[in-house]
From Swiss-Prot:
Residues reported to bind [4Fe-4S] cluster 2: 252, 255, 269
EC number: 4.1.99.22
Protein name: GTP 3',8-cyclase
The family this protein is said to belong to: Belongs to the radical SAM superfamily. MoaA family.
Cofactor: [4Fe-4S] cluster
Listed GO MF terms: 4 iron, 4 sulfur cluster binding; cyclic pyranopterin monophosphate synthase activity; GTP 3',8'-cyclase activity; GTP binding; metal ion binding; S-adenosyl-L-methionine binding
Entry-linked Gene3D superfamilies: Aldolase class I
Gene: moaA
Role noted for this protein: Catalyzes the cyclization of GTP to (8S)-3',8-cyclo-7,8-dihydroguanosine 5'-triphosphate.
Keyword tags: 4Fe-4S, GTP-binding, Iron, Iron-sulfur, Lyase, Metal-binding, Molybdenum cofactor biosynthesis, Nucleotide-binding, S-adenosyl-L-methionine
Listed pathway(s): Cofactor biosynthesis; molybdopterin biosynthesis
Catalytic activity: GTP + AH2 + S-adenosyl-L-methionine = (8S)-3',8-cyclo-7,8-dihydroguanosine 5'-triphosphate + 5'-deoxyadenosine + L-methionine + A + H(+)
Length: 323
């Protein structure tokens, strides 16, 4: 599909649940966020149907998100069904890694290609603080299992916040040098509870500068996966570092994605309030041609770019939208 700005839209991010086993401070309050009722959430067979329709419109890549997607029952079955859909070239998943150790090999066997794991600190106590309940040992078990299962390249998503974990930038770079891991530093965005954290923002150029003064960097185009990161190899290292810059140097001109929320809404842009209901027509028995037209309408509504730098704020938590 092509939008009104001649961008090819071939990537669908599907939030398969709004539930999460953690309460990360920049994502949601300690009490969590209001959850949708069971009937409000797309059923697995509905997700598979919409994925099949999306593939028919030109979607070739799907990423499963949440919430935390691995808390969804029968997620392995869902992956297997999605992997069997003609036209879908890649199924990937973003997770906090807590349950990945137990599921990595089953997910790989079902057809999952690779994983991104959210990890904002390498320190046990700090991890517990930021997640309010997590155990970093479980995350490392998940990382090792993902590598062993071949869910590669394994990428670690790191949101850097000033005064909290910016002292670990070089620690993460060292990890990428010593291990076959790909660290993606992501600029803090004004979404959910992070909307009130303006002073915590650290631009990617500052992060890159700190790293390059210690570890020489060279462009790493081999890791290109049609995503927004600018990737670099640490000379002599086993992994890489990448920088995702939604604030300082947005990548809207090459955006190729749609989002499907857990409650069945299509979002043309993460940073836009507009949503299009597709669950309602699906449950009302709409034919697949009508559902395909709804996908096409969502694509036609994609804005040219976001407006976060102009003070726009997303009131919904990332777990509600689908990160």
């Amino acid at each position: 599909m092509q939008d009104t700005f001649q961008r090819q839209i071939n990537y669908l991010r599907i939030a398969i649940t709004d539930r999460c086993n953690l309460r990360c401070r920049y994502c949601m309050p300690a009490t969590g966020v209001p959850l949708k009722g069971h009937e409000d959430i797309l059923r697995l067979e509905e997700i598979a149907t919409l994925a099949r329709v999306a593939a028919g419109t030109g979607i070739s890549r799907i990423r499963l998100t949440g919430g935390e997607p691995l808390v969804r029952k029968n997620v392995v079955t869902l992956v297997r069904e999605l992997a069997a859909i003609p036209g879908l070239e890649e199924i990937s998943l973003t997770t906090n890694g807590i349950f990945l150790g137990a599921l990595a090999f089953s997910l790989k066997e079902a057809g999952l290609k690779r994983v991104n794991i959210s990890l904002d600190t390498l320190k046990k106590d700090r991890y517990r603080y930021i997640t309010r309940r997590g155990n970093i040992t479980s995350v490392w078990q998940g990382i090792r299992a993902a590598l062993a299962a071949g869910l590669t390249p394994v990428k670690l998503n790191v949101v850097i916040t000033r005064g909290f974990n910016d002292d670990e930038i070089l620690d993460f770079a060292r990890l990428a040098r010593e291990e076959p891991l790909h660290i993606r530093f992501i600029e803090l965005m004004p979404i959910g509870t992070a909307a009130a954290s303006g002073t915590a923002y650290v631009p990617a150029e500052e992060i890159k500068g700190r790293i390059s003064r210690v570890y020489p960097l060279e462009p790493f185009p081999d890791l290109a996966t049609n995503g927004p990161a600018a990737n670099f190899r640490l000379v002599g290292g086993r992994g890489s570092v990448g920088f995702i810059t939604p604030m300082s140097n947005h990548f809207c001109s090459r955006c190729n994605r749609l989002r499907l929320t857990a409650d069945g809404k299509l979002r043309p842009c993460l940073y836009w309030d507009g949503e299009i209901d597709i669950k309602g027509p699906l449950r009302a028995g709409a034919p697949e041609t009508e559902l395909a037209a709804i996908f096409a309408r969502a694509v036609s509504l994609k804005p040219a770019e976001h407006h976060m730098e102009n003070g726009w704020r997303q009131p919904r938590a990332m777990s509600q939208i689908g990160g």
